[in-house]
Design a protein with these regions (language model features):
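Amphipathic alpha-helical assembly/interaction segments
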Residues: 1-113
């Protein structure tokens, strides 16, 4: 078992979390304390699930939950772009990070089935 903080998927998720904390500061008040907080919470939960999956004997269900979380994060990011809370450039950057995490989770899931 690898240390969780050495996993590429953990590192990519942590980088995504940092980026989310940076850009949610720019949200209008209406979105900062609703969608912004939900986005942060979902990303923190994603990182927690990656930790749990790494330390669990049966990883599959936890990885599936993590994949659900990354899709919710993707949805929130798209919503914030459509509501003009983040620029298209920022959305593309965040979406690349989300896609990177998603691909790694999918690969991890395939490796444990």
């Amino acid at each position: 078992m690898s240390k969780y903080d050495e996993l590429p998927v953990y590192k990519a998720s942590y980088d995504l979390l940092l980026e989310i904390f940076r850009f949610t500061k720019e949200f209008n008040r209406e979105f900062k304390y609703t969608v912004g907080e939900s986005l942060k919470k979902e990303t923190l939960e994603l990182i927690t699930l990656i930790y749990r999956a790494n330390s669990a004997r049966e990883k599959l269900e936890t990885i599936k939950l993590a994949r659900e979380r990354i899709e919710v994060i993707r949805l929130f990011a798209r919503l914030m772009k459509d509501l003009r809370q983040i620029s298209l450039k920022k959305f593309v950057q965040v979406n690349k990070q989300v896609e990177c995490v998603s691909k790694q989770l999918t690969g991890w899931q395939k490796s444990v089935t």
